[in-house]
Swiss-Prot record:
Annotated InterPro entries: D-Glu_cyclase (IPR009906), Putative_hydro-lyase (IPR038021), UPF0317 (IPR016938)
Key words of the record: Lyase
Keyword Lyase: yes
Enzyme class: lyase
NCBIfam families xrefs: PRK05463.1 (NF003969)
GO MF annotation terms: lyase activity
EC number, as in UniProt: 4.2.1.-
UniProt name for this protein: Putative hydro-lyase Rpal_1947
Domain of life: Bacteria
Homology family: Belongs to the D-glutamate cyclase family.
Length: 272
């Protein structure tokens, strides 16, 4: 597991970090997509499981680092993850959550205080929103940000390596790009292996099991121009699919596109 130390900098209660401001907004009830929120700061997907299943899920993430790169993990029963942020409370600091029972989605609350238990372990998994900042800095347009919608995500026929009860296909996120931008995007995102890295597929969505690219399994559809290619990255929503398939008695995840904003800096995730 790779856990990055939170950015060390002075914190003034009157001038909180943009990332902390984002979490406080969520705590106050804001429930919107976090794409483009708090530029420069790492965002994460969330998976919360009973301790009984935590070791197997951790192993699943280790075996599948492209869709499931761990950037932080809580102690058992502790909703605070200080390595990821000041005053970060996993129960309140995301815009919206999903509560699962026996593999079925039963609720989508804006906080999980009433659902928290002493046996729960929270995993924060890297999110492609982190490398989007680098793409934008390279003048590569990102359609879902332009359209102000959630990134489209799809179940594929790409199998993940199983671990314990957890198995299933990879989920991918898609961004339409012109060929020259797609080539540059490969180069840019290869520098960020801890937030999914380079694309796993370009073009021909049918070859990875996507029957209709206009109908994403998660998120929102975006237009694809006639001179553009769909570019697919491994996605941190993959754990939701495998947790649902495993039918564990109880689990909590984030709502797709509504992420945890941490105090980690995107620039510190780059390897080159």
């Amino acid at each position: 597991m790779t856990v990055f130390a939170a950015e060390q900098q002075f914190h003034d209660a009157e001038r909180p970090l943009p990332s902390h401001q984002a979490r406080l907004a969520c705590r106050a009830g804001l429930a919107e997509t976090t794409a483009g929120v708090a530029p420069g700061f790492v965002q994460g997907n969330l998976a919360i499981l009973p301790e009984k299943y935590a070791a197997a899920f951790h192993r699943f993430c280790q075996l599948n680092p492209k869709p499931c790169p761990i950037v932080g993990m809580s102690d058992v029963g502790n909703p605070m993850i200080p390595s990821l942020g000041i005053d970060l409370d996993i129960r309140t600091d995301l815009p919206r959550y999903r509560v699962w029972r026996d593999g079925e989605l039963v609720e989508e609350p804006t906080d999980i205080v009433a659902h928290w238990r002493d046996d729960l372990v929270a995993f924060v998994i890297g999110c492609s929103f982190s490398f989007e900042e680098a793409l934008l800095a390279d003048d590569i347009p990102i359609r879902h940000i332009e359209e102000k919608v959630r990134v489209p995500m799809y179940r594929t026929n790409i199998p993940c390596e199983p671990a314990g009860p957890f198995s299933g296909p990879m989920v991918v996120s898609m961004r339409p790009l012109k060929p020259k931008d797609a080539i540059r995007a490969i180069q840019v995102t290869s520098r960020f292996p801890s937030v999914h890295g380079a694309p796993v597929h370009i073009g021909l969505p049918q070859s990875i099991g996507i029957a209709d690219i206009a109908k994403p399994d998660y998120g929102d559809p975006v237009p694809i121009g006639p001179d553009e290619l769909p570019v697919f990255w491994a996605c941190g929503v993959t754990p939701q699919a495998v947790i649902a398939a495993a039918k564990v008695p109880f689990a909590i995840t984030h709502a797709p596109g509504l992420m945890l904003v941490t105090d980690l800096k995107n620039k510190h995730l780059a390897v080159l």
